Amino acid sequence: MDRSLRAHGGALVANGRLARVRRIVGVIGFHFASLDIREHAGRHHEALGELFDPLDVAYKVMNPEQRLGHLIQELNSRRPLAPPHGQNEHDNLTLFRTLRSIMDREGDHVIGAYIVSMTRGVDDILAPVLLAREVGLVDIGQGIARLDFVPLFETIDDLRAIGPTLRTLFDGQAYRQLLALRGNCQEVMVGYSDSN
């Protein structure tokens, strides 16, 4: 931020308010604030499609019901999907690796919620859970669940389907166990992006 401000004529702000914030953070850290992460549901499916390609799993062409069945199967499995760190990996998997690194260094409290925008169905919620499992942020069998996954419902149809979607989500054993590890509390966000 400092470099960007200076490069674009904002040296006054960089030397003033930003410098003051940097000094405070340098002394006490970000321990009083957490960061919510928001990512579009489609990005998770893209990343998983790339992970499944070498395994000859046609994830990219599956419909939501097929994806859901496959995601449940993978969450109940212990097999790793991701290649060793850094080998042609999708930037969404890199995001989860970065979150893990930050949480390992600073503590789990620095990341608040992982928000899944444009959630349409249960598969959209389980996809980032599986990606988080790949980097060790979730391991239900070992009792590890370091993130809260928050669906964000935004279209009229999705808003109308919240009840059945959440019932299906909570009926699933893997997600139910994850939820128990997180204190049996599920945050849900409601937005509205269909207005024109």
Tell me what each language-model feature is.
Residues M1-R105:
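Extended, charge-enriched "interface" segments that sit outside catalytic cores
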